[in-house]
Design a protein with these regions (language model features):
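ABC ATPase NBD coupling module
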Residues: 22, 76-93, 122
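Short coil-to-helix segment of the ABC ATPase nucleotide-binding domain corresponding to the Q-loop/switch region
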Residues: 105-114
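A short, flexible loop at the N-terminus of ABC-type nucleotide-binding domains that lies
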Residues: 4-8, 17-30
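Conserved ABC ATPase "signature" region
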Residues: 74-75, 112, 123-137
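The feature captures the beta-strand-to-loop junction immediately N-terminal to the Walker
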Residues: 44-46
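Conserved ABC transporter NBD signature motif
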Residues: 67-78
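Short beta-strand immediately N-terminal to the Walker A/P-loop
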Residues: 41-42, 94
Length: 137
């Protein structure tokens, strides 16, 4: 029996450059990253090292200058905005550095809220929220 976990996110040779006036600024050069199901990954580095840019690319919010992005083995590198939006909605989640819970809501209600905004019915959202809270503690 094969116990190897499935790769859920893979970045291959990701490069990202920006223009500052007439200068080209290379922010990421040849980054490879593979994340398997159930893994927890931390990106650490000094300010300006490209962490946020890499996360924006991995989250399909930013397009790399070159390289490939695979989500559940599907090459997402050349997808249009509509399909990228659907993949973000269905498979990705973000917790931003400066996040705030809604103080008048319970933990369960705070977890339910993005699902309800996405159109998930309340029963399903509550069930999934409880599962997530139990899993994450």
């Amino acid at each position: 029996m094969n116990n190897e976990k499935e790769t859920v996110l893979e970045l291959k040779q990701i490069c990202k450059s920006f223009r500052q006036g007439s200068q080209k600024l290379d922010v990421l050069t040849g980054v490879d990253l593979e994340i398997k199901s159930g893994e927890i990954v931390a990106l650490i580095g000094p300010s300006g090292s490209g962490k946020s840019t890499l996360l924006q690319i991995a989250g399909l919010l930013e397009t790399p200058s070159s390289g490939e992005i695979y989500l559940n083995r599907q090459n997402c590198s050349k997808l249009g905005d509509g399909l990228r939006t659907l993949l973000r909605r269905d498979f990705l989640g973000f917790v931003y550095q400066y996040h705030n819970l809604l103080p008048d809501f319970s933990a369960e209600e705070n977890v339910m809220l993005p699902q309800l905004i996405a159109g998930v019915n309340a029963g399903t959202a509550r069930e999934k929220s409880r599962w997530l809270l139990e899993r994450l503690g």
